[in-house]
């Protein structure tokens, strides 16, 4: 659990984590990682609100062959595909939610 959970600061370093994950891929460092290390190293792609990063996430987690992680990546991807962002972050980041996002947030499993 993050010490900044439910606070805007929780997302302050996301860009750095994503940069490091991209470097890990670019340099091929992940090839020496075990599955748990790969799961962790690839998470910034899953947590990114950039659609292209979501596609990378799906490919990475699909190649890992762990159903639970792939299903989580797919869930994140589908939310970004539909809304272009994670609606559960709106309140924390002081973003205005659309009516569609508000309806979505009332459904079970809409938040992480």
Regions found by a protein language model. Give the residues of each.
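Active-site-proximal binding-pocket segments
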Residues: 1-56
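Acidic, Mg2+-coordinating active-site segments of isoprenoid diphosphate-utilizing enzymes
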Residues: 5, 88-92
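Residues that form generic nucleotide/phosphate-binding pockets
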Residues: 23, 44, 60, 79-82, ...
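Charged, gly/pro-rich active-site loop segments
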Residues: 52-68, 73-76
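C-terminal binding/interaction regions
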Residues: 65, 72-81, 87, 97-99
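A charge-rich, low-complexity, intrinsically flexible signal that marks solvent-exposed coils, linkers
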Residues: 88, 97-110
């Amino acid at each position: 659990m993050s010490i900044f959970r439910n606070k805007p600061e929780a997302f302050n370093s996301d860009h750095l984590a994503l940069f490091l994950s991209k470097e890990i891929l670019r340099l091929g460092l992940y090839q020496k990682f075990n599955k748990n290390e790969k799961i962790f190293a690839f998470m910034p792609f899953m947590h990114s609100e950039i659609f292209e990063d979501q596609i990378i996430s799906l490919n990475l987690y699909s190649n890992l062959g762990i159903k639970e992680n792939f299903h989580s990546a797919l869930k994140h991807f589908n939310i970004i595909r539909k809304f272009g962002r994670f609606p559960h972050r709106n309140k924390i980041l002081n973003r205005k939610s659309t009516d569609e996002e508000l309806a979505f947030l009332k459904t079970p499993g809409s938040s992480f």
